[in-house]
Amino acid sequence: MIQAQTLQHFGNGAREGDQSYFDPGAPPPFKIADIRAAIPKHCWEKSTLRSLSYVLRDVLVVTALAASAISFNSWFFWPLYWPAQGTMFWALFVLGHDCGHGSFSNSSKLNSFVGHILHSLILVPYNGWRISHRTHHQNHGHVEKDESWVPLTEKVYKNLDDMTRMLRYSFPFPIFAYPFYLWNRSPGKEGSHFNPYSNLFSPGERKGVVTSTLCWGIVLSVLLYLSLTIGPIFMLKLYGVPYLIFVMWLDFVTYLHHHGYTHKLPWYRGQEWSYLRGGLTTVDRDYGWINNVHHDIGTHVIHHLFPQIPHYHLVEATKSAKSVLGKYYREPQKSGPLPFHLLKYLLQSISQDHFVSDTGDIVYYQTDPKLHQDSWTKSK
């Protein structure tokens, strides 16, 4: 029997009965309509020209970086190029993500066209991921129905093979999980983002999934051709390493938007779950200089509740909503130029947030104290 840590305190560190006590799992005293009303009307307005200007900016930076790498092709430039280009790949992903939400423009055709280009270039199947991400937003904070970084139940956790358990809960493996998730989803779930007959998709969505998989295949074929033409080592340096940096950013950011807060946050089942309560379990993060580069994706609470708000209005919308959210909004810790401070929360969460109870409509992450002891013993 796994011995789990019992939740000792709530969202602000106070115990029940203390004057400062706050239970983050309690139903909020406001409705989602109250939050919506607090957000200025212009924050809902989408500007196609403004959105396209961000695409142009990012594509120009990606092109300039690649051209510089090809031109210099020297040992001192590559270590500078890799994190810069990988971060820009991540920025392209966020713009494609906005297309998937429809916050890029009011034209569904333009959203689909731009989204397919941006995501295919970084080997993401646009429609396959867009649909599963929609499921994530519609069911955020739900133990069984959520899609992204879903907590494992104790039963599923105990049934993991040793290798899967080690990879999931040992740094740095979790921040390289995204390509595997695209192919096979998370433990306890079945399906692939590339398979139109996966249970991720309805029959009416299959054609779009086929289109995205074909686009993904075309880009992969071009990359393989270039590898044969200019050499696999050069392509690894030009595209492969930045792709891995992009994957690290994606997993790092998405994980910490739903995990790793200073105090444990609830997950829900059954009648305790609601769209509002699930959305309030998300966490805003400050990424310093990277905030502007990756289009303010750190303003995650309001984005999760209202994904149709364009990214360039999220900061203002968040400020306006704070008066309604009260203690249900957790102010992010300020970052230096680069968000190195977040590594601490990532490592703490990976080492402590292992599973949730098989039963109960409001549950919190629990820790398996034997996990790393067993891994160490078996490795000796």
UniProtKB/Swiss-Prot annotation:
Superkingdom of the organism of origin: Eukaryota
Induction (free text): By auxin, ethylene and wounding.
Subcellular location: Endoplasmic reticulum membrane
Keywords: Endoplasmic reticulum, Fatty acid biosynthesis, Fatty acid metabolism, Lipid biosynthesis, Lipid metabolism, Membrane, Oxidoreductase, Transmembrane, Transmembrane helix
Transcription keyword on record: no
PANTHER family per the UniProt record, alphabetical: OMEGA-6 FATTY ACID DESATURASE, CHLOROPLASTIC
Record-stated family: Belongs to the fatty acid desaturase type 1 family.
The name this protein goes by in its record: Omega-3 fatty acid desaturase, endoplasmic reticulum
Provenance organism: Vigna radiata var. radiata
Protein encoded by which gene: ARG1
